[in-house]
């Protein structure tokens, strides 16, 4: 449900962009994001740090995009956010030796340290790849192509990353289930 709420502003942005243009799409994105943050807060009683960061960046860069009628600001947002997430994951692992992924999921999963580290590194690499893809598409292709890829391409890539994560974790989850059944 939460993921669906997070996807709605993006779909609205895409539809308004295709029908009306950049300025109206950016305003729609900002308003839909504000509404989405409020709904998540009401329904789930909490906003995650990443939701605050993404939400505020959408609002700031969306307002700049609407004001200047220039999609470049939203293009930068995607690059900056992906770079920021990658940096946080890498710093948490290599500087503080406490992978963010472990901090987020340790209550649900008990995994060996090397698995947490690989998982954390895998997601950092994913965000770096998304950042680089965004730079390439935003600079070498039309705004229409970028908007389409931003809406559907990154969503598809995220789904693939989640599936790969599930496949990677499956043996460990199965092992945990077997251990719990034996108790």
Curated annotation (Swiss-Prot):
Pfam families: IspA (PF04279). The keyword Cell membrane applies. Keywords: Cell inner membrane, Cell membrane, Membrane, Transmembrane, Transmembrane helix. One of its GO terms (cellular component) is plasma membrane. It is found in: Cell inner membrane. Its main location: membrane. It is a multi-pass membrane protein. It comes from the Bacteria. The chain crosses the membrane at residues 22-44, 53-73, 76-96, 121-141, 153-173. Plays a role in cell envelope biogenesis, maintenance of cell envelope integrity and membrane homeostasis. Belongs to the YciB family. This is Inner membrane-spanning protein YciB. The gene is yciB.
